[in-house]
Regions:
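Proteins synthesized as precursors that undergo proteolytic processing into mature forms
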Residues: 1-104
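Terminal-appendage/accessory-domain detector
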Residues: 64-65, 81-84, 90-141
Length: 141
C-alpha cells in the first residue's frame, strides 16, 4: 500500500510519520434479520467502493447468485469520466454529455470482488472475480 498513488500521493516511503495510513479497504457484510446474506470485499484502490456497491445491488436487488453478480459488467465514475465495461449501455450518458472511457473486455481496473451469499432459500453461492484470477466453490457438507 505504501506505493499506492491514490493512498500515498507523496510516493513510496514518504508517508508522514505518526499519521494513520489511509485505506480504501471496505470488507462488507449485508445482513437480513441479523444473519449474513452476503459478505464481500474487493481489491481495486478507489474503485473498490463502486465494485462492492454494484455487486450488492445485483445480489440484493436483482436476485443474482454471487458468481453472476461478480462477473457482471461494471461502471465507475472518476475525474469527470464514466468508465464502462462491455455490456453497460452508455448511450444515455453520452446523450447527457458525459465523457465515456470504454473498455473492450472485463478489466482489473474495475476491482476484484470476492463474494459469498446465501439466498432466501438458504442456498449458498460464491463469486471470484475473473478480472483478477479469482475463484469460488461451494462445498456441500
Amino acid at each position: 500500500m505504501m506505493g499506492e498513488q491514490d493512498l500515498n500521493p507523496l510516493g513510496f516511503h514518504r508517508h508522514p510519520p505518526g499519521r494513520r495510513m489511509p485505506s480504501m479497504m471496505s470488507p462488507t457484510a449485508v445482513l437480513r434479520d441479523g444473519a449474513p446474506e452476503l459478505v464481500l470485499g474487493s481489491a481495486g484502490s478507489n474503485r473498490i467502493r463502486s465494485a462492492i456497491l454494484q455487486t450488492i445491488i445485483r445480489v440484493v436487488d436483482d436476485g443474482l447468485q454471487a458468481g453472476d453478480a461478480v462477473d457482471a459488467p461494471r461502471v465507475h465514475f472518476e475525474d469527470g469520466i464514466v468508465y464502462a465495461e462491455p455490456g453497460i449501455d452508455t448511450v444515455p450518458l453520452e446523450r447527457a454529455g458525459r465523457a465515456i472511457g470504454r473498455f473492450r473486455e472485463l478489466n482489473l481496473f474495475f476491482g476484484g470482488v470476492q463474494a459469498a451469499a446465501r439466498d432466501s432459500r438458504g442456498r449458498l453461492s460464491g463469486g471470484g472475480d475473473p478480472r483478477r484470477g479469482g475463484a469460488a466453490l461451494v462445498v456441500e457438507a
